[in-house]
Regions:
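N-terminal [4Fe-4S]-dependent radical SAM core
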Residues: 7, 12-38, 51-57, 174-175
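Conserved Radical SAM active-site core
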Residues: 15-19, 33, 51-116, 121-128
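A generic structural signal for alpha->beta connector loops
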Residues: 16, 112, 134-135, 159
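P-loop/Walker A phosphate-binding loop and immediately adjacent motor/lid segment at beta-alpha junctions
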Residues: 93-99, 104-107, 148-178
């Protein structure tokens, strides 16, 4: 079900990516201690979503050089394992170009840091996207409230998958991250 404000938007309207928060020292959204970028914009509208405030792509703050530098300052710390893109949905159409460029820049500047990405989209529908060459782990699938399980690691509902992106691209089949 698409949120009403998205139905009112023009599909040709292009905005700079916006975000709600940059979380530092996060241990819940991927392996190790991480920095998390919570982007604005999501058209999945999952019932029971933990972050419905991030659905509106015009909410939050504009992702600018200062925000990027804030992420880079964290990634400069040896104890930070990497960055996680969440939201909202980093693969929301209005975010894809900016998040791909950011992921590319992070991989070039910090090749030993990992990039995790959470999306409501399924692997099979995004496997051809350029961003995946920079992503290490992808958590795919919409959150389904009826399949919610708080004991699951790195995901909210049992239908979601935690995918090793590079191995999956290499083998041509979904390889789960362990």
């Amino acid at each position: 079900m698409c949120p009403l404000f998205l139905l009112k938007q023009k599909s040709t309207e292009v905005k700079n990516m916006r975000y709600h928060n940059i979380t530092k020292d996060d241990m819940l959204n991927g392996d190790g201690l991480r920095t998390v970028l919570w982007v604005a914009g999501c058209d999945h509208g999952c019932k029971g979503c933990q972050n419905p405030v991030t659905w509106d792509p015009n909410s939050g703050l504009e992702f600018d050089e200062a925000a990027k530098e804030e992420i880079f300052e964290q990634l400069n710390q040896s104890y930070i394992a990497g960055v996680t893109f969440s939201g909202g949905d980093p693969l929301y159409w209005g975010n894809v170009a900016d998040i791909t460029e950011l992921a590319k820049e992070i991989k070039e500047k910090y090749p030993k840091k990992t990039i995790w990405l959470y999306t409501g989209s399924l692997w099979e529908s995004i496997v051809e996207m350029d961003i995946l060459q920079y992503v290490d782990v992808l958590v795919d699938g919409e959150f389904i409230e009826e399949k919610k399980d708080v004991s699951l690691k790195w995901k909210g509902s049992s239908n979601q998958r935690v995918i090793d992106v590079q191995q999956s691209l290499k083998t041509g089949t979904v390889v789960l991250h362990t």
